[in-house]
């Protein structure tokens, strides 16, 4: 998917509210 401009190394993706998920320490949108 497309990168959401957020990392999830130390904290979860806040962008999960818009459909993003954590993959390889970076938040992606499927």
UniProtKB/Swiss-Prot annotation:
Name of the protein in its database record: Cyclotide cter-G
Posttranslational mods: Contains 3 disulfide bonds.
Source organism of the structure: Clitoria ternatea
Family listed: Belongs to the cyclotide family. Bracelet subfamily.
Domain comment in the entry: The presence of a 'disulfide through disulfide knot' structurally defines this protein as a knottin.
Sections of the chain in a coiled coil: none
Cysteines joined through disulfide linkages: 4-20, 8-22, 13-27
The protein's role, per its UniProt record: Probably participates in a plant defense mechanism.
Cross-link (Cyclopeptide (Gly-Asn)) at residue(s): 1-30
InterPro entries assigned to the protein according to its UniProt record, in alphabetical order: Cyclotide (IPR005535), Cyclotide_bracelet_CS (IPR012323), Cyclotide_sf (IPR036146)
UniProtKB keywords: Disulfide bond, Knottin, Plant defense
Gene Ontology biological-process annotations: defense response
One Pfam family hit: Cyclotide
């Amino acid at each position: 998917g497309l990168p959401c401009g957020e990392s999830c190394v130390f904290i979860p993706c806040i962008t999960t509210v818009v459909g993003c998920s954590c993959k390889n320490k970076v938040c992606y949108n499927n």
